[in-house]
Design a protein with these regions (language model features):
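Alpha-helical transmembrane segments and their immediate juxtamembrane cytosolic regions
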Residues: 1-331
Length: 331
């Protein structure tokens, strides 16, 4: 099973659709509860979406580079990975400043920025580290992250308290070393330290992709994906007793749990679509094969919709007032 997998395109597309829905609800005052992220510790269905996309980033790296093994010019490949990651990062910055272009209030982190870092580091890991070490790298990194977040004293504060946003090492690093503005006044969910475990989410995708392109029997490969996923879910539950499931911190338990679910979902979609030939996900496939473009287009259109830079009044206000005038209340 080599090359482009329809199941991965579909899964990426479905994930992207939910990312757009979650990020652009229309009104933050009237959002269906499952489409909101957990305030801090805890989990909602929405908290699964972004890590699944990062997982697919890892899978896609393997599917793309595996076809060229033996033909790869490593230096050229490195340059391409760096250049693409840089472009994704710049687009993320553009979405933040558009359409006001207020460079005094720029946010250097964000969804696309995190995707760019995950793509960059996972690409390098795939090129320079033996595949058999991927899981060791993941587990060791997540245990070190767990230790840092639970046991390393915060300068000027003391022992961390993971029950609140302001009393952890990730907050301390972002507050003191992250330039620009943060998503929240005191912390950023795509901050510096939390990017490390998010990269491991991408490495889990590298592991899944490596399994998918191996020469083993397809049934054995899908079962292996499922069982790895199941084990990771149990490991995540174990760590949650000391380091709660928390998307904002990309906690160790959260990384294991979401990675495990992505392993199992990848196995299920591969079986359903690539093995059984289920073909009723055409729209998701279109989104999945043009994911970054679609995400950026949605961001630009929404920014214009809520901006008064063009005609002096928000298009959203015109739309909402028109609905109200016709007796339809947008709640």
């Amino acid at each position: 099973m080599k090359g482009r997998l329809l199941s991965i395109d579909v899964l990426r597309g479905m994930t992207l659709i939910f990312m757009i829905i979650v990020n652009q609800p229309g009104s933050w005052d009237n959002v269906f509860a499952p489409l909101l992220h957990a305030d801090w510790n805890g989990l909602t269905p929405t908290d699964y979406i972004f890590p699944n996309f990062l997982f697919i980033v890892g899978v896609s790296i393997v599917l793309s580079l595996n076809n060229k093994k033996g033909l790869l010019d490593r230096n050229k490949t490195i340059k391409k990975i760096i250049w693409r990651a840089f472009k994704i990062y710049l687009v993320g910055l553009f979405l933040w400043i558009f359409p006001s272009f207020d460079f005094d209030n720029i946010r250097w982190t964000g969804v696309l920025q995190r995707i760019s870092f995950v793509f960059l580091f996972c690409g390098m890991i795939y090129l320079f580290i033996e595949k058999r070490y991927f899981m060791y790298l993941s587990v060791i990194t997540l245990i070190l992250y767990w230790f840092i977040m639970l046991y390393i004293p915060i300068p000027g504060i003391g022992q961390p308290d993971l029950s609140v946003p302001e009393l952890n090492m990730a907050h301390y690093i972002d507050k003191n070393y992250l330039p620009g503005i943060m998503w929240q006044d005191t912390w950023d969910p795509e901050g510096i330290l939390t990017t490390i475990p998010s990269i491991i989410t991408g490495v889990f995708g590298l592991i899944a992709g490596t399994i998918l392109v191996s020469s083993k029997d397809l049934k054995d490969k899908l079962l292996k994906l499922f069982y790895i996923g199941l084990i990771l879910v149990f490991v995540g539950d174990f760590f949650s007793w000391s380091f709660p499931v928390n998307k904002n911190l990309w906690s160790t338990s959260y990384t294991f749990l979401m990675g495990g679910m992505s392993f199992m979902l990848t196995a299920a979609f591969t079986y359903l679509i690539d093995v059984n030939g289920y073909k009723k996900f055409k729209m998701s496939q279109v989104f999945g094969t043009n994911s970054i473009f679609t995400y950026v287009l949605a961001g630009v259109l929404v920014s214009l919709f809520y901006s008064d830079y063009i005609i002096g009044i928000q298009l959203n206000s015109i739309f909402v007032n028109t609905l109200i005038d016709t007796g339809v209340y947008p709640k």
